[in-house]
């Protein structure tokens, strides 16, 4: 198959639409459904991310994409009991690749509603069973077990999008893109991200444990496929907050940091103790938790309202309790796709438990950024490599 006709492009008025190869066969097979234009943008970007993440870490990897940026990405380390609870995966059998996807989707479950999933490894029944429970547009993987494919084909009334990609496919070294009838040409960003990038530690504190190195690689590879400007917070093998497509660096850091704070707060005892009414849908639980953690908590706790969601009216999680809980957190890594121009990014990041930073460096104020890290004992590595993605 050299081309695949699509229903329309980004919007219904954008016709005709297709994906095609000028030379050779498309490296994919559509095993189920009818993926659209944006689905394929998500699929091909997310596949590159998980493929490179597995190559860099040696672990199964997964991503959850929305509108051509990752809402989350992760490697397949086992889940704790608390993580199983906040990801609605209690009592489920979870293979390493299933753990990777559960973590990737769990980074920001609200943003992952209707996501495109990407798996570095063959999709097995464990992963398919979890996907079947979630609202998702489709999945790309290098293969599917018979049982997994049968499960996925029952999703969305049989219309769930399932794409298989040739894991050995390698694109051309030069890529093209048309904008306003004008063709842009550039070398593909084939820069390999690995531990050698982390050797230039510029702070007084140079203690970088293996777990932090892994998390730095996850941050950098996630950023490589996130619309710029972008910042990514990572902890324990998974993204916990991705700030994408912002026009100032500090807004990226704040956006991603606020998402990371929400991830941390979902593990607060008051959140873990929320008692939901029987039969509540997973998206409704996600929405309720998100509102409960926000300043608009009365929208779900008001008299006559809370009964729709909770069996018992929850106690308010106060601003003081939130601040105290987040202040106790540590071991978080943050990555940036371009240099931090000011120390304010470090000041914001450390409020979310950040102890490790990886970024290109190259600002005229690098000395100030380094000094801010030194003030808090943060370890920072300069990679010398910008990772813009558009």
Predicted segment positions?
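Gly-rich Lys/Arg/Thr-decorated short loops/hinges at beta-loop-alpha junctions or inter-strand turns
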Residues: 22-34, 107-113, 187-206, 283-305, ...
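Conserved helix-loop functional segments at active or binding sites
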Residues: 52, 225, 262-266, 351
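C-terminal accessory/binding modules appended to enzymatic or scaffolding proteins
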Residues: 197, 209-210, 214, 218, ...
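Flexible, glycine/charged-enriched surface loops at secondary-structure junctions
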Residues: 56-64, 162-165, 228-235, 265-276, ...
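Active-site-proximal loop/turn and secondary-structure-junction residues that shape catalytic pockets
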Residues: 69, 123, 235-238, 340, ...
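Glycine- and Gly-Pro-enriched alpha-helical subdomains that act as flexible
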Residues: 71-110, 240-340
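Active-site loops and adjacent core secondary-structure elements that bind or stabilize anionic groups
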Residues: 1-197, 212-230
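C-terminal binding/interaction regions
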Residues: 115, 119-120, 133-163, 168-170, ...
């Amino acid at each position: 198959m050299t081309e695949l006709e699509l229903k329309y492009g980004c919007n219904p008025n954008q016709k005709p639409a297709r994906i095609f190869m000028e030379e050779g066969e498309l490296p994919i097979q559509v095993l189920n459904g009818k993926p659209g234009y944006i689905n394929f943008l998500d699929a091909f970007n997310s596949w590159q991310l998980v493929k490179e993440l597995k190559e860099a870490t040696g672990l199964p990897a997964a991503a959850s994409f929305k509108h051509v940026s990752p809402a989350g990405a992760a490697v397949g380390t086992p889940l704790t009991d608390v993580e199983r609870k906040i990801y609605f995966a209690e009592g489920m059998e979870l293979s390493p690749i299933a753990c990777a996807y559960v973590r990737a989707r769990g980074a920001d479950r609200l943003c992952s509603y209707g996501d495109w999933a990407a798996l570095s490894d063959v999709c097995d029944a464990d992963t398919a069973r979890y996907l079947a429970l979630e609202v998702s547009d489709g999945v790309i993987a290098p293969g599917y077990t018979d049982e997994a494919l049968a499960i996925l084909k029952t999703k969305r009334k049989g219309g769930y999008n399932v794409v298989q990609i040739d894991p050995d496919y390698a694109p051309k070294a030069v890529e093209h893109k048309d904008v306003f009838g004008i063709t842009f040409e550039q070398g593909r960003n084939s820069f390999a991200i690995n531990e050698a990038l982390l050797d230039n530690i510029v702070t007084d504190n140079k203690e970088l444990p293996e777990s932090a190195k892994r998390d730095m690689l996850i941050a950098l590879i996630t950023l490589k496929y996130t619309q710029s400007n972008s910042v990514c917070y990572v902890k324990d093998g998974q993204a916990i907050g991705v700030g994408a497509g912002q026009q100032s660096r500090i807004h990226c850091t704040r956006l991603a940091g606020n998402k990371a704070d929400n991830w941390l707060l979902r593990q607060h005892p008051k959140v873990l103790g929320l008692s939901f009414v029987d039969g509540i849908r997973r998206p409704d639980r996600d929405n309720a938790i998100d509102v409960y953690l926000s300043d608009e908590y009365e929208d779900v706790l008001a008299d006559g309202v809370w009964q729709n969601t909770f069996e018992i009216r929850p106690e308010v999680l106060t601003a003081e309790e939130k601040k105290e809980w987040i202040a106790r957190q540590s071991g978080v890594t943050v990555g940036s796709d371009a240099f931090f121009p000011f120390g304010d990014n470090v000041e914001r990041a450390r409020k979310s438990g950040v102890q490790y930073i990886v970024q290109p460096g190259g600002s005229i104020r690098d000395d100030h950024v380094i000094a801010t890290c030194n003030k808090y004992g943060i370890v920072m590595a300069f990679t010398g490599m910008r990772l813009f993605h558009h």
